[in-house]
């Protein structure tokens, strides 16, 4: 693999020499940083099994190497990477996998270690969505996830990834993560804080990542991280699990933040060692049981992961002064909900008791039941999935609901050819050789729902959202 030139400030190298355990080679560290990062993917088990995915992609000649800490994660090598971007493959477009760096799969693995099965989870800094979608898959779309993102511009990307992966149990918020301890005290069974950091571990992906690095900025970032972990710890219920992670390497933003929390709340904080998380985890284990992953250990990004338990309640914070505002939705009455459920089932859309129908004007939404306790405490950017819009002739079913709820075995399902599927993703109407019988057609490819179409004569009218339409070369190789 080709080398690339990484910029290292002298003070950074001095700091790394001090931080690195004596069992590791500093020369190996420098050499690893100069190698481009291996690409990796995570199979979306909400859509397919690992075995079925491997069988589906076997003809492509992809070399898939298992990632030790994530059963559904693989490093990937492809001969035609330049000819067809991974994000333009049919399997990516239909949500069968997520392009995710191997190290970033560690925090969710830690969150669900030892059979942990939380029902209400918060992802404090969620965009672009790799960990939120991984959490949703581990929860099998059950329970509820609050996915927060402070950056307004990244909330849209977060929602797009959640929708593509067919996730229904997520509520999105757009807040500074420091508000949650006061706003929703002791409300979550598990919390992931993948904290904003100095990014020292990502130089293999971005050789200029350290251009603006300084010891002073590390200290400023660490101060924010302490405030974030304090807030998250308050939002965690007693007995709950908190995972703190960063993609940086210095101790100030990693071990020191966790030790500060322990010094602040004493016996209420219990560190849960991660040495048994996966075979070979001990190579990155610190004396406190954290994983401090230098890039040469597993040939991946630099990363840090800590897992802790809140053993007892702590004093609550003053209530926040902001006003949430009126909640513009109302629950749908049982009789009407039954009629809506029946109409949805006729086009292949079904859901279980984890989701409940709500209405806003002519919009119908499905909210995860587990998030209802937070209504009135925080303001949501988006809640659950939009099911339909009502009109005089019935319902206009929404694309995100089709991707999350549709069964490819429904009677109205119609399998497209590769060329027809590519036309669909380009936003064009499809003219199949043998037209389907149903008027509302569940369009599938590779036995995966990819949209809902109206049959007009021999034509399938495209309903693929304009913002998702793809140009350029796609999976058949045609531009």
Swiss-Prot record:
List keywords of the entry alphabetically: Cytoplasm, Methyltransferase, RNA-binding, rRNA processing, S-adenosyl-L-methionine, Transferase
Question: In the record, what terms sit under GO molecular function?
Answer: RNA binding; rRNA (cytosine-C5-)-methyltransferase activity
Q: What Gene3D superfamilies does this protein map onto?
A: 3.10.450.720, Vaccinia Virus protein VP39 (3.40.50.150)
SUPFAM superfamilies in the record = S-adenosyl-L-methionine-dependent methyltransferases (SSF53335)
Name the catalysed reactions. cytidine(1407) in 16S rRNA + S-adenosyl-L-methionine = 5-methylcytidine(1407) in 16S rRNA + S-adenosyl-L-homocysteine + H(+)
Note the superkingdom of the native organism.
Bacteria
User: According to the UniProt entry, what is the EC number of this protein?
Assistant: 2.1.1.178
Instruction: Please name the catalytic residues of this protein.
Output: 247
Q: Which PROSITE patterns match?
A: NOL1_NOP2_SUN, SAM_MT_RSMB_NOP
> Which InterPro entries does the protein's record reference?
Methyltr_RsmF_N, MeTrfase_RsmB-F_NOP2_cat, MeTrfase_RsmB-F_NOP2_dom, Nol1_Nop2_Fmu_2, Nop2p, RCMT, rRNA_ssu_MeTfrase_F, RsmB/NOL1/NOP2-like_CS
Q: Name one GO biological process term.
A: rRNA base methylation
Q: List cellular component terms (GO).
A: cytoplasm
Compartments reported by the entry: Cytoplasm
Q: Where does S-adenosyl-L-methionine bind?
A: 125-131, 149, 176, 194
- NCBIfam families, alphabetized: nop2p (TIGR00446), PRK11933.1 (NF008898)
Q: What does this protein do?
A: Specifically methylates the cytosine at position 1407 (m5C1407) of 16S rRNA.
- Recorded family membership: Belongs to the class I-like SAM-binding methyltransferase superfamily. RsmB/NOP family.
Write down what this protein is called.
Answer: Ribosomal RNA small subunit methyltransferase F
Q: What is the lineage of its organism?
A: Bacteria, Pseudomonadati, Pseudomonadota, Gammaproteobacteria, Enterobacterales
């Amino acid at each position: 693999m080709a080398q690339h030139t990484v910029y290292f400030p002298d003070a950074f190298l001095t700091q790394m020499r001090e931080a690195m355990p004596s069992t590791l080679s500093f020369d190996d560290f420098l050499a690893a940083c100069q190698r481009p990062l291996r690409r990796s993917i995570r199979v979306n088990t909400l859509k397919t099994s690992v075995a079925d995915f491997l069988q589906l992609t076997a003809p492509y000649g992809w070399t898939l190497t298992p990632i030790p800490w994530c059963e559904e994660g693989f490093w990937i090598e492809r001969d035609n990477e330049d000819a067809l971007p991974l994000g333009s493959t049919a399997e990516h477009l239909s949500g069968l996998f997520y392009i995710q760096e191997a190290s970033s799969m560690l925090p969710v693995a830690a969150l669900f270690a030892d059979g942990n099965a939380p029902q209400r989870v918060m992802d404090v800094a969620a965009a672009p969505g790799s960990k939120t979608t991984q959490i949703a898959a581990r929860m099998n779309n059950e329970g509820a996830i609050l996915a927060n993102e402070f950056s307004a511009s990244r909330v849209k990307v977060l929602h797009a990834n959640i929708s593509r992966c067919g996730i229904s149990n997520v509520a999105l918020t757009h807040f500074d993560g420091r508000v949650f301890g006061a706003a929703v005290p002791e409300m979550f069974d598990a919390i992931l804080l993948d904290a904003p950091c100095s990014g020292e571990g990502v130089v293999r992906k971005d050789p200029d990542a350290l251009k603006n690095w300084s010891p002073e900025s590390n200290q400023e970032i660490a101060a924010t991280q302490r405030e974030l972990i304090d807030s998250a710890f308050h939002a965690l219920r007693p007995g709950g699990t908190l995972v703190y992670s960063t993609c940086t390497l210095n101790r100030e933003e990693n071990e020191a933040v966790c030790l500060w929390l322990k010094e602040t709340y004493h016996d209420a904080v219990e560190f849960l060692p991660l040495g048994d998380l996966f075979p070979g985890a001990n190579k990155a284990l610190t004396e406190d049981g954290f994983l401090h992953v230098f890039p040469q250990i597993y040939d991946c990004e630099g990363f840090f992961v800590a897992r802790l338990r809140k053993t007892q309640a702590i004093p609550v914070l003053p209530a926040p002064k902001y006003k949430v505002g009126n909640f513009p939705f109302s629950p749908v009455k049982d009789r009407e909900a039954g009629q809506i459920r029946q109409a949805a089932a006729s086009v292949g859309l079904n859901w279980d008791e984890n989701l409940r129908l709500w209405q806003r004007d002519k919009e119908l939404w499905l909210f995860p039941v587990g998030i209802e306790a937070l209504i009135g405490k925080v303001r949501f950017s988006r809640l659950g999935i939009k099911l339909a819009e009502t009109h005089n002739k019935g319902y206009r079913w929404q694309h995100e609901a089709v991707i999350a709820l549709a069964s490819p075995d429904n009677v109205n399902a119609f399998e497209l050819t590769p060329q027809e599927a590519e036309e669909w993703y380009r936003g064009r109407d499809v003219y199949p050789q043998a037209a389907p019988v149903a008027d509302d057609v569940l369009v599938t490819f590779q036995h995966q729902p990819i949209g809902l179409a109206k049959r007009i004569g021999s034509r399938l009218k495209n309903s693929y959202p304009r913002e998702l339409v793809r140009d350029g070369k796609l999976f058949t190789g045609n531009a």
